[in-house]
């Protein structure tokens, strides 16, 4: 059953395109917006526009940052361990490790994993950027690259691919410990489990 309002139906269809959002949830969100004050709806509209216009990838680590704030605050941060780079799949994974308050090194965000079935190859993720970063003068301070990808088939494939590229550089490549459920995404793992996985990492 469809609404008689084409505007509401259009909004429902757009919400339903978001990950994890079905039609029923899209309907609830649409009804919520319909009942909100115009000023609140305008704030949401502005936030959606801003995130596309003002957010960029950090020129160093590829994490998200604002235009005019590049490199990002983590890459510029004082007190970070410059000898370690933790390689993750997506920006939410950076937040997950930062919440543990245990890891104080740097990061590199791949923005995906190698997945031939989905048509995603090594050139489609930020592997070249990692290699270029390590070849720069600042990159020569790095003694360990920690592979912290989700324990999926695609994640493991990416870990193996990247580690083979890095080993000739003389950099120690490690992987976070098992204990994270197979198929789980790091952004949904609790801080204690992530801390143990980081502490128990092994050399590849």
Curated annotation (Swiss-Prot):
- The scientific name of the source species is Chlorobium phaeobacteroides (strain BS1)
Task: Note the Pfam families from the entry.
Answer: RecR_C, RecR_HhH, Toprim_4
Q: Name one GO molecular function term.
A: zinc ion binding
Is Zinc one of the keywords UniProt gives this record?
yes
What are the start-end ranges of the zinc fingers (C4-type)?
Answer: 58-75
Q: What does this protein do?
A: May play a role in DNA repair. It seems to be involved in an RecBC-independent recombinational process of DNA repair. It may act with RecF and RecO.
- Cite the entry's keywords alphabetically: DNA damage, DNA recombination, DNA repair, Metal-binding, Zinc, Zinc-finger
Q: Which family is this sequence assigned to?
A: Belongs to the RecR family.
> What Gene Ontology terms for biological process does this UniProt record contain?
DNA recombination; DNA repair
The Toprim domain is annotated at 83-181
What the entry lists under CDD domains is as follows: TOPRIM_recR
According to UniProt, the name of this protein is Recombination protein RecR
